[in-house]
Curated annotation (Swiss-Prot):
EC annotation from Swiss-Prot or TrEMBL: 2.6.1.9
Gene3D superfamilies: Aspartate Aminotransferase, domain 1, Type I PLP-dependent aspartate aminotransferase-like (Major domain)
Residues bearing the modification N6-(pyridoxal phosphate)lysine: K231
Record-given protein name: Histidinol-phosphate aminotransferase
GO MF term set: histidinol-phosphate transaminase activity; pyridoxal phosphate binding
BP GO annotations: L-histidine biosynthetic process
Protein encoded by which gene: hisC
Amino acid sequence: MELRDLSDHVEYRAGRGIEEVARELGRDPSEFVKLSSNENPHGPSPKATIAIREAATGVHRYPKAVHADLTGALADRWDVGDDQVWVANGGDGALDYLARATLDPGDSVLVPSPGFTYYGMSARFHHGNVAEYDVAEGADGFEMTADAVVDAYDGERVVYLTTPHNPTGARFTLDEIVAVADRTDEDTLVLVDEAYGEFTETPSAVTLFDGQPAGGHAPRDDIAVLRTFSKAYGLAGIRLGYAVVPDSWADAYARVQTPFAASVIACQAGVAALDDDDHVEATTDSVAWGRDYIHDELAARTYESHGNFVLANVGDAGRVAEAAKREGVLVRDCTSFGLPEHVRITIGTRSETERAVAVLNEVCDT
């Protein structure tokens, strides 16, 4: 038999791991620091680590009860109803659920360029078409504006807004998000990806739902918000994310989710991580320091960032990333994002960040 036509589909390529690079170069993994995948260098929440150990003996059971526990904890955190929280196997799983709930074959979505490849991948998996809007660099850096989105809008069923945006670090304000929703059709979903939301002081778009303190904005039923445990909570390896949706979608989750959408271990870890504010605060404080340090000390143009990373214009991203790799520092060459002059530097520990800046200054100067 033949597969369906996959010619329009692209491969998602994650940043390479330390072990893979070490094998390639014939060196010891301990020689490298990985600042290429926006992971939490401080590791998982200590409370989550304990919960993972305790959950291990229960993995022969399906996660129905603990799934409900996590859903309730998230609903309490955001002051929404349990039915408004769609727990998933990573943020990408939540994207798939939202695509299933909104897209008919032939519908189109509007995604940022550059941006997260999986937005378009998920739409195409669900027989949708993909259009793009530009995240352009202006005199003051990269900006996220409603005008840029709406100028490219042509009635798409879903519009994806990433805030803070990867890889630029720029953000949408709530006013700009509302402007996009106001200026698109009432049947268009504005999907706000807040995977890096813990690292910005901008209020979450969850505050735009009915019953929330939206700062003077009318409540919306055409916005959904994506969140993840991969970044600030340090749980990227267990794959846990969720969407927060309008209360009018109450019965849709059961119709679009996979059976037991997240594992016992993931759900237990998520519940524990939500109760570990000290870990999140230490992480975000470290990121704030690291962003300032890179902006101040890196001898290349950097851009204001509201994520756990900084984008830098180094002239030839491929050459610089390769040279840094040979010096033991892995950063993200952003050529694949359409930014061949830029690298993205994840904020590491203090020593990792200082080492990365020193190496990049050296290789950029050669």
